[in-house]
């Protein structure tokens, strides 16, 4: 909880958890993930609200808290959410920015089958599907590409390309301080890898290790070439496979370039969630696709201990 709500975050010195109280009772709660959206030459201060909830009475307490949080940023972002979120956000004037899709690729179908709590026909069907997907997925790494793990104490002195806006696509900034914050996550192991081609830095990815599932919570390569994006994601799968307990690798993305690359690397679409942005400063939202991954929220590290598999 301390790391999530109070640990130091760049450009957000205060607590990131907020409550609304009435007569000493908490009636609404929400926490924020501070983000900086890069679009053309603009820097848009965005917050993603997580852990948002409110009591039925007094009516409107959750909406009021959301509006108060919105006063601290240019925009508020929602990715999916509860039925209440999906109703309230559009009612507040939020604009839909597409869909965030979840993807998964099986790593060890037999190990997953042996770990099933209930060995029924559904488990057998999942094994057969996972085996088929594994056989169909590409496995060889492209020549000249390599991934090198970067530890927290190496981060400040290691150069690698970070996300930059492209024509028709807005991205979220990745500062050294924000990456360092995630490497200090106490609930899951998060690994950072710099990606190189012929020893030239080209990009990076972040993995969250949750025993049976490895998540690609962020990935980027400084290229518009589909082959370079495939190399990036195949390297991520290769590193995920180095964890012997992992039976699948999962990720999330909204932009078409990343999504197409994931499909070509053997990932399968496992569901989607609506993206919404609420313009709080009235200075205008990005007129482009919004690139969203797991790192924009608590999907990067959230789990209940058992880890629900999705492949």
Go through each PLM region and give its residues.
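Active-site/acyl-donor-binding loops of N-acyltransferases
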Residues: 76-137, 191, 204-227, 234-311
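Alpha-helix termination/capping residues and helix-transition junctions
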Residues: 70, 187, 242-243
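Residues forming well-ordered secondary-structure scaffolds
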Residues: 44, 60-64, 80-87
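Amide-forming acyltransferase catalytic core, primarily the GNAT-like/NAT-type
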Residues: 1-40, 44, 95-218
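Beta-hairpin (beta-strand-turn-beta-strand) motif
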Residues: 35, 52, 81-82
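Conserved acetyl-CoA-binding loop-helix of GNAT-fold acetyltransferases
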Residues: 51-72, 78, 226-239
